[in-house]
Amino acid sequence: MEQFRNIGIIGRLGSSQVLDTIRRLKKFLLERHLHVILEDTIAEVLPGHGLQTSTRKLLGEVCDLVIVVGGDGSLLGAARALARHNIPVLGINRGNLGFLTDIRPDELEEKVAEVLDGHYLVENRFLLQAEVRRHNEAIGQGDALNDVVLHPGKSTRMIEFEIYIDGQFVCSQKADGLIVATPTGSTAYALSAGGPIMHPKLDAIVIVPMYPHTLSGRPIVVDGNSELKIVVSKDLQIYPQVSCDGQNHFTCAPGDTITVSKKPQKLRLIHPLDHNYYEVCRTKLGWGSRLGGRDD
């Protein structure tokens, strides 16, 4: 297994719990004589840290491993910045759900030590890349680990659009919007809209309509290498938005085209050896436990 010597730390701003966890993590890593580099934004709220700092984009060039302290949203942002560097990312959960940041703060030293000693699992999670075009000219681009979402923005009106897959017309729809999600994102917004849960190892994309004005509007799972094209109706009276992971936003105009496809670079997500995807789903989504209360 890969040995990590240069460790980057990214943290969610605005949380004293995150700062406390970063201090613990810093102390633990330095005791192991590792080189620790703080993202510059979190370094600003940690006076006297005494560490090298770096922008998020450059962390991928100077680190062997990046540890994200926060929630899934924090890891989503880090993933988009770091995927192009092919650098492993490990998450310590200081958020709510923790589908991606799966190390609890109370087990920080134990689990991080296991990873540093070479005992870990690596998952390659693919991202989506989206491009908004107007009059055949790109006006916005973004990446997403979870999903690319077409939605009405501040308006309450429905959106009318056409869907094409690999150049073939699929259907037109009137709906509140459309979610295009990866397997990683299938347990996020797409799940709330009635989409299926997809195992992270699946090479597939799910297209989930949001409140379609039809009884036949259902999610569609397509090959992960498909290219999706969404054409906003020219007669639309509103200016909908495209969001990548709910964090990057672009405003569309009637007649615009949104192209969504798999990004060539993948996120290398690190897990402890005892990571169990189904246990995560069972815990986070409230699935039923073993009959009779057995834990074997």
Curated annotation (Swiss-Prot):
- First-tier enzyme category under EC: transferase
UniProt cross-references to InterPro entries, sorted A to Z: ATP-NAD_kinase_N (IPR017438), ATP-NAD_kinase_PpnK-typ_C (IPR017437), NAD/diacylglycerol_kinase_sf (IPR016064), NADK (IPR002504)
| Keywords attached to this entry | ATP-binding, Cytoplasm, Kinase, NAD, NADP, Nucleotide-binding, Transferase
GO annotations of cellular component type: cytoplasm
Recorded source organism is Pseudomonas entomophila (strain L48)
Q: Looking at the Swiss-Prot or TrEMBL record, what is one Pfam family this protein matches?
A: NAD_kinase
Q: Where does NAD(+) bind?
A: 72-73, 146-147, 157, 174, 176, 187-192, 247
Q: Name one GO molecular function term.
A: metal ion binding
PANTHER family in the record, alphabetically? NAD KINASE (PTHR20275:SF0)
Q: Which family does it belong to?
A: Belongs to the NAD kinase family.
Q: Which reaction does it catalyse?
A: NAD(+) + ATP = ADP + NADP(+) + H(+)
Per its record, how is this protein called by name? NAD kinase
**What cofactor does this protein call for?**
a divalent metal cation
Q: GO biological process annotations for this chain's record?
A: NAD metabolic process; NADP biosynthetic process
From the Swiss-Prot or TrEMBL record, state where the protein is found: Cytoplasm
So where's the catalytic machinery, residue-wise?
72
User: What EC number(s) are associated with this protein in UniProt?
Assistant: 2.7.1.23
Question: Is Secreted a UniProt keyword of this protein?
Answer: no
Q: What does this protein do?
A: Involved in the regulation of the intracellular balance of NAD and NADP, and is a key enzyme in the biosynthesis of NADP. Catalyzes specifically the phosphorylation on 2'-hydroxyl of the adenosine moiety of NAD to yield NADP.
Answer yes or no on keyword Signal.
no
